[in-house]
A protein has these predicted regions:
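Secondary-structure transition/capping motifs at alpha-helix termini
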Residues: 1-10, 35-40, 157
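Surface-exposed patches in mature extracellular/periplasmic domains of secreted proteins
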Residues: 5-12, 86-97, 158-160
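Metal-dependent peptidase/peptidase-like ectodomains
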Residues: 18-119
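Residue-level preference for alpha-helix termini and adjacent loops
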Residues: 8, 30, 40, 106, ...
Length: 160
């Protein structure tokens, strides 16, 4: 989507996939502990089970954790949902100390602002039943759009 926009981002974007989360955040922890320019990382987006449903009464529900000391991250999502008419119902969770068992923790420990898209503990989490037929594709599509917009703000906002 960034390439298709025709606009070159102000900052570099790195897409990464980690391994060993359940074994102690091995991949993300190694990355942040060995990265020579860690202070240059302006933000981190993490996704856990974002196509899943944990609330039968609200199929567009998800949790949006973000670093509390960076309230613009929450404002960006609110504005983008309204402006682009995304069918999402986020539970905003500003977080003073965003650590925990997922990979955003490795970045938060280095004072890097994080966003963590999550659907709470849903029935298929880390189970053999976690398969394509359980994905809510419309929600996954809108979360993908929202995360693109959040990344767009992070890489193009001159004051970020």
């Amino acid at each position: 989507a960034f390439v298709k926009s025709g606009v070159r981002p102000r900052r570099t974007i790195v897409f990464a996939f980690w391994d060993g989360e359940e074994l102690g955040l091995l991949g993300s922890r190694y990355f942040v502990n060995s990265h020579k320019d860690i202070s240059q990382i302006k933000g981190y987006l993490n996704f856990d089970m974002v196509g899943g449903n944990n609330r039968p009464d609200d199929s567009q529900y998800f949790v949006y954790f973000y670093t509390e000391s960076h309230p613009r991250i929450g404002e960006w999502l609110k504005d983008d949902i309204a402006h682009y008419q995304l069918d999402l119902h986020p539970n905003y969770k500003p977080w003073d100390n965003p650590v925990g068992g997922s990979d955003q923790s490795s970045f938060a420990r280095h004072a890097i602002p994080i966003v963590w898209y999550h659907t709470d503990a849903q029935p298929h989490y880390n189970q053999p039943s976690d398969e394509a037929s359980t994905i809510n594709y419309p929600k996954l599509t809108d979360i993908t759009r929202a995360s693109f917009l959040t990344a767009w703000h992070m890489v193009n906002d001159a004051t970020w």
